[in-house]
């Protein structure tokens, strides 16, 4: 067993997705020396990418000559050094022969539609003397027939290894064993089989040791990847220190785990505090929907959807689109999901009756709702308005209705809404579903959004459109402060959106453009401080 399972550390390459490969020169050297001292079989020192310039603080290099500028003079012990090329990002002209390079091997990652030219590239690298690893990105996207075609190419080129790459952390043990057995059964016996895991389902380490144990009586070499403290893209990888410990304790391998722990303590934990990787809700949602994690990030970052809604949208992803991220595709799915068209004529008739002859005060979530409370209280005492808050129930104010457009905000307010159910009217857009029963008024979402706007479902503007259509003629506004990049924008920090500070000026400009148009049908008056222009 001892000789046919080997380990590869990919901290400096996969971990670099978290910090743009900017580890700092001292950390690069520190990690290198600790991995070598631990006796790990292979060390992946980073990416080869001709689009990048040389930086001694980064583990991403324009060519093989640049790798030697950082690592060339260091003692590598028994550890073999490899770099990685994402096929198409580093031309062969940027790669020296193995005799000229400090690298022993090169790993080539490629998606299935590029398998033929990528394997031809692997052949070129092999002819230059390198130990070559063919890395099957997104293994779960391969059908059995496609994998057999890839195996045909592998048996022709005969790289050092062909690796199962669970790019999105989708594999459970049964699926992993299926791919492993296909490779073990059909790939030339001189070619090693590799496994690169991701931790979306908290299975990276478990799958690795399951595979190691399944492989124990076979003569082929198995190569398992890991990284210090699991440092890697998104959900991260199998922790190399755990793999080394397992191999030491169960199979007599002489890895020095203490060296890895020193590297984690001195070099990796400070990075973890700053960047944080590992199992997360986003990683789980992506893996449970068998999809690219960017789809999840796109939807979650909208800050308008519940996780249930995110899952429902992701369930509509089709075919190869699931793992090949397409921003326009997910935007259209989001739009289609939110559309939920409905006939709201009866709802508007009801609102007209409810609001007939009333002044309306609309409360937003800006900090002035607290800072300028006396002005709001004075207005309520003088005008006795019908009070509507947007997507929240404010502390210290009695409201007559809540306008709901945002599923996430609604879920955060459910208990408060239930507590005030007897006296509170709920006006909701059709993209929301009530937890129990029906909303008092459900309005067509699609008719209220502006798809040309940077923030298409601006609840403030949507509210004003509703009031205009309901025949309201006198509207006071409080807590609509406008957005700023250098201060908190909400009275409660938990309501803050990350994108607001990035897009705040664009949102402000849009509101300034739309308010005069809405002001033609009704009087709009801000009674708290705002960045918006006077109407």
Language-model segments: what does each one mean?
Residues 1-345:
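Catalytic cores and adjacent flexible loops of soluble metabolic enzymes
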Residues 342-535:
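Metal-ion/cofactor- or nucleotide/acyl-coenzyme-handling active-site neighborhoods
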